[in-house]
């Protein structure tokens, strides 16, 4: 019984590795495709005739009837591809995705914005007063900074690097102060810790949101580094290929020079005797050259 249970469990695991195909794949047959083509031809003729009648009667066509006429009946409707989703977002794989790839602001995420998005208000007095508010009272820092440009949806895109650094420093100071206040509350009245935990959570979310604004810059820099590494690797491969080519050329030259010297030493002593005794002509010299080439190739292959 135990072996049967293990085999059934293994079969379930194997069958659950990949999801089964959708059931409407069975409708994609040649007969249904032919029926769909005939239906589309008939539907085009009927729609043209109905539009002509509506123009003659000066009546507006009903949108519901037109949508119903554009959908084939029965199982043929599964052969028509679905329409593109309308609106700013769509659902896929259990999540909601935006068509426009941008970082949502904190207001859209139902969180309070603590940092200031206006770049014109960053003077020495404003930063000093903000820092004093952080040190004296953290609650006024959270509520006070939240009121400034909290509803600006495009402020995050217009933030400069200097502004982000200043706001991150202020948020870090506020985070440290809230942590110290939380320790003091826990030592005096631990029941009142909830409000400080909420403030720390809110500050951390704002810090995380500001850091996420650096994601496009990080992706560009990482892409540049990847391309530079690929270019360096290609140059290294080219250098190695050139070195191998030069090495092979030098080996070929050395083999040719060695063979020529050996042949020249042997032929100079025996040229007169071979021509007198055998009477060989130009054909024999051609055979010697071919043999020389073959010997050089063989030695080259053996050396490689």
UniProtKB/Swiss-Prot annotation:
Annotated stretches, region: Disordered: 42-85, 137-158
Subunit and partners: Component of the Mediator complex.
Functional description taken from the UniProt entry: Component of the Mediator complex, a coactivator involved in the regulated transcription of nearly all RNA polymerase II-dependent genes. Mediator functions as a bridge to convey information from gene-specific regulatory proteins to the basal RNA polymerase II transcription machinery. Mediator is recruited to promoters by direct interactions with regulatory proteins and serves as a scaffold for the assembly of a functional preinitiation complex with RNA polymerase II and the general transcription factors.
Any single biological process term in GO: regulation of transcription by RNA polymerase II
Gene Ontology CC: one annotated term: core mediator complex
Full protein name: Mediator of RNA polymerase II transcription subunit 7
Keyword field: Activator, Nucleus, Transcription, Transcription regulation
Keyword Transcription regulation: yes
Record-level Gene Ontology MF annotations: transcription coactivator activity
Localization per record: Nucleus
Gene: MED7
Taxon lineage: Eukaryota, Fungi, Dikarya, Ascomycota, Saccharomycotina
The family this protein is said to belong to: Belongs to the Mediator complex subunit 7 family.
Coiled-coil region: none
Keyword Nucleus part of the UniProt annotation: yes
InterPro entries noted in UniProt: Med7/Med21-like, Mediatior_Med7, Mediatior_Med7_sf
